Regions:
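His/Asp/Glu-rich mid-to-C-terminal helical/loop segments that flank catalytic regions of hydrolases
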Residues: 209, 227, 231-256, 303, ...
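Midchain, well-structured core segments that form catalytic/ion-binding scaffolds
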Residues: 125, 131-292
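Alpha-helical metal-binding/catalytic segments enriched in His/Glu/Asp
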Residues: 76, 86-126, 215-221, 227-253, ...
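Active-site metal-coordination/substrate-binding segment of hydrolases
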Residues: 44-48, 53, 63-157, 161-165, ...
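N-terminal capping segment at the start of a domain
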Residues: 2-34, 149, 380-381
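A non-catalytic alpha/beta surface segment that caps or lines the substrate-entry region
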Residues: 21-67
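A short beta-alpha structural unit
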Residues: 28-32, 264-272, 283-290, 315-334, ...
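Zn-dependent metallopeptidase/amidohydrolase metal-coordination segment
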Residues: 10-18, 77-78, 278, 348-399
């Protein structure tokens, strides 16, 4: 750790932000709300102390740039927005660790590092208000679906387009933000794990292999409504019975392939206590880092649903709700992340990310990307009890700073090639 890096300052600033933007129920920095704007003003004041070039792009992402000897840029990303009643670290740790790294780099290199270093606060990573996650980063990557996004409204009926306008953002120009990635040569992101894997392994930090691919479907079983008292069990065409069999089957499929499956919603018709279920709709969310394994998981689930439908003399239909391809992160940056963690903590574990992150959108744009996870106490996030040990936060800032330095040195190394170039 260099003298200019102060992980305890990151801790103090995280607590300062918590006091400013949280209540007894947790963090309230929902994007495109007054508290979120207040948090951004607070962050901007911190950035202005470093005399950086600061601006907001067409999608509402805020960029702070320390110009270097080269225009090629190392980008450090995070998000200051939260879910309602959220935790104090999700997203904000990324930004404030990045802020501390900017301080160190500016001091060490007398204001002129070998490459430009940029910190970005992505707009609306959580999607808590309008239901669309990764808003700012997907606009910047060019993958945002404007047709689907145009009609989004919050629970009060306020249109996303109108909320954007209130914050000075023109919906029609969202994709113009893509110019921000033109000189990006590497992207790194620190994040709390939001799960229990590092906790169970008793490890402070982990290197992220990539983000899971997602197959999310609605599955509807249709049978026959009948009186619950007068219909014998062997004469029922019970849609719920067939749907219920999918629950243990989803666990079998997930365990067999090393992925995860979740049946998250279930609704029935006619939905009364005195009727056999005529229609049962469930949602199945399947995730895996390997696209072939994810495809096999989906195929097995389809075959199983057909079998259960036949056994119960009901029909079944599928509707795709979401498909996201698995996104592996850059192997060279992953090796540097592994190295930085070993130098800091002595041990490291490589794991995939189940949740989606802005890093995935940057990787989809073709920018070499790496992520580092820090252990989450209780394995819980998106909750006011979200927490991480202070010594682990400090270790994360130190290791993340090492990764930033290693990434900069990699960028100026002659003959460097990316995964995409090596595989072309």
């Amino acid at each position: 750790m260099t003298a200019a890096l102060d992980p305890q300052r990151t801790l103090r600033e995280l607590k300062e932000l918590r006091a400013l933007t949280s209540d007894e129920n947790g963090a309230q920095r929902v994007a495109f709300t007054p508290i979120w704007a207040k948090a951004r003003d607070w962050l901007r004041q911190k950035l202005e102390e470093l005399f950086l070039e600061i601006h907001r792009d067409e999608a509402g992402n805020v960029w702070a740039t320390l110009a270097g000897e080269s225009d090629q840029a190392l980008v450090i990303g995070g998000h200051i927005d939260s879910v309602p009643n959220g935790g104090w670290l999700d997203g904000s740790l990324n930004l404030l660790a990045g802020l501390e790294i900017l301080r160190r780099i500016k001091t060490q290199y007398s204001g002129k590092p070998p490459v430009s270093v940029r910190l970005v606060d992505w707009a609306d990573e959580e999607g808590a208000r309008f239901g669309m996650s990764l808003f700012g980063s997907s606009a910047c990557s060019g993958h945002i679906n404007l047709a689907e996004t145009r009609g989004l409204q919050d629970k009060d009926g306020i249109a996303l387009i109108d909320a954007l306008a209130e914050h000075g953002i023109d919906f029609e120009r969202l994709k113009d933000s893509g110019r921000e990635l033109q000189n990006a040569e590497a992207y790194i992101e620190l994040h709390i794990e939001q799960g229990p894997i590092l906790l169970d392994l008793d490890l402070a930090l982990g290197a992220v292999l990539g983000t899971f691919g997602v197959e999310r479907h609605a599955i509807t079983f249709r049978g026959q409504a009948a009186h619950s008292g007068s219909t014998p069990m062997n004469r029922r065409r019970d849609a719920f019975l067939a749907a219920a069999k999918m629950s243990p089957e989803s666990y079998r499929i997930a365990n067999h392939h090393g992925g995860v499956c979740t049946i998250g919603t279930c609704s029935t018709l006619p939905g009364i206590a005195t009727s056999v279920v005529a229609e049962c709709r469930i949602t199945l969310d399947q995730r895996h880092l390997d696209p072939a394994a994810l495809a096999r998981m989906l195929e097995e689930a389809r075959h199983s649903s057909d079998r259960f439908a036949e056994e119960g003399d009901v029909s079944v239909s599928w509707e795709r709700l979401m498909r996201i391809e698995p996104i592996p992160f850059d192997s060279e940056l992953l090796a540097l992340c592994d190295e930085a963690i070993r130098e800091t903590c002595g041990a490291v574990y490589c794991l995939p990310s189940g949740p989606l992150h802005d890093a995935a959108e940057v990787a989809r744009a073709g920018i070499p990307t790496a992520m580092m996870f820090v252990q989450s106490l209780y394995g819980i996030s998106h909750n006011k009890i979200e927490d991480t040990k202070e010594e682990h936060i400090e270790a994360a800032v130190i290791a993340f700073d090492k990764l930033a330095e290693k990434a900069m040195q990699l960028m100026v190394r002659p003959g460097r090639s990316t995964d995409a170039e090596r595989n072309s």
